[in-house]
Amino acid sequence: MKVRKAVLDDLPYLVNFTAEEAREAEGSIKIPETLEKGILVALRDPSIATYWVLVDENNTPVGSVSAVREWSDWNAGYYWWIQSMFLSKSHRGKGRMSLLLDAVKHEMKEQRGLELRLYVHKDNRTAVRAYQNAHFSKSDYEIMILSN
């Protein structure tokens, strides 16, 4: 197993992983064409988001992670956010999530990022436990939204 930066040929896998992540995390069904459009934009412009894939011995993606950056004027640097992360069920519970996180953390440190953050659906207990096992902790902040 190894982690590498995603390439355009990985797009079908990334679309599938993202759709499955949304279904598992929120019970929501996403439109594949919309996912493809959004992921493709980021694959072509890494300033929007960066994707990595975990591949098996045949170089077939079995999981992915994407990260975005948020500027902090208070700290004059970028916070890195896990935007999405997914592992195929057959690869869960084997320490493979840490391979994906290590790739993100490595690049974040190279670019002098401030810290790695993520948000997780409050009812997704499996993901919360996995992130806690990866040493993420709860923040003092809550996410709030203003809908159109």
Placement of each model-derived feature along the sequence:
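Acetyl-CoA-dependent GNAT
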Residues: 5-9, 16-77, 83, 101-103, ...
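A short, internal acetyl-CoA/4′-phosphopantetheine-binding micro-motif in the GNAT/acyltransferase core
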Residues: 82-92
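Conserved acetyl-CoA pyrophosphate-binding loop and the N-cap/start of the following alpha-helix
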Residues: 91, 95-103
